[in-house]
Amino acid sequence: METATLIAIFISCLIVSFTGYALYTAFGQPSKELRDPFEEHED
């Protein structure tokens, strides 16, 4: 394969994996450990 194709595939995989990790952190199991600053400072 050409170098440009490999670089494009590599960057695409990086973007997809980062997006998947961000969604897992936001909505998956680790989301229970996230704190909500708006709930901590109710008036």
From Swiss-Prot:
Topological type in the membrane: Single-pass membrane protein
Q: Name one GO cellular component term.
A: chloroplast thylakoid membrane
InterPro entries per UniProt: PSII_PsbN (IPR003398)
Transmembrane stretches in the record are 7-27
Main localization is: plastid
Q: Name one GO biological process term.
A: photosynthesis
Q: Where in the cell?
A: Plastid, Chloroplast thylakoid membrane
User: By its UniProt entry, which Pfam families does this protein fall under?
Assistant: PsbN
Keyword Cell wall biogenesis/degradation assigned to the entry: answer is: no
Key words, A-Z: Chloroplast, Membrane, Plastid, Thylakoid, Transmembrane, Transmembrane helix
The family classification in the record reads: Belongs to the PsbN family.
Stated role: May play a role in photosystem I and II biogenesis.
Protein name per the record? Protein PsbN
Q: Which organism is it from?
A: Psilotum nudum (Whisk fern)
Which gene is this protein's source? Answer: psbN
